[in-house]
Amino acid sequence: MNIWTNLAAYSLIETQRLYLRPFLFEDAEDFYKIASNPENLHFIFPAQADLAETQYVLANYFIKNPLGVWAICDKETNRMIGSIKFEKLDEIKSEAELGYFLRKDFWGKGLMTEAVKELVNLSFEKFQLKELKIVTHVENIGSQKVALKAGFRLFRQFKGSDRYTRKMRDYYDFRLGRGDFYE
């Protein structure tokens, strides 16, 4: 089996407090609650002006190519509260970059760390990846804590162009290799 077959087999994932599942168009209102608040996505993309814009983003960037993209749902309410996805997946090198966001009122509860740890485990055990990385803005302390708690190590700091503002920014590159995972 290749990576895509394995990802298809794990389109639904359950953790202690979360469901990870493919996005649905019905998630648009929950997605809008996240995307319309600039505090939720300060480091991801600009706040969205209205539900129609959110529906466009949801359909074109989260639903259109569903493999390796999960809606994070709270088990208690079954509401979509965030996303976790392989931003960049290199099938040849067997490596991927994880990207994620979570609604602000769910921050600080260990939920994103729980989701990342589950994907780390699946990435090395089932998807046969050799390395994972997480890239954060230097100012994004919350995402850095998630990366470290999930076992990633700081690999380097670098400058890069922000994909939305086109301004040069400082980033941290965290890495976790298959060998590090099994230590």
Give the role of each language-model region.
Residues 1-42, 69-183:
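Acyl-donor (CoA/ACP) binding surface of acyl/acetyltransferases
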Residues 39-59:
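Conserved GNAT-fold acetyl-CoA-binding loop/helix
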Residues 59-71:
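A short helix-loop-beta-strand connector motif used in the catalytic cores of GNAT acetyltransferases and
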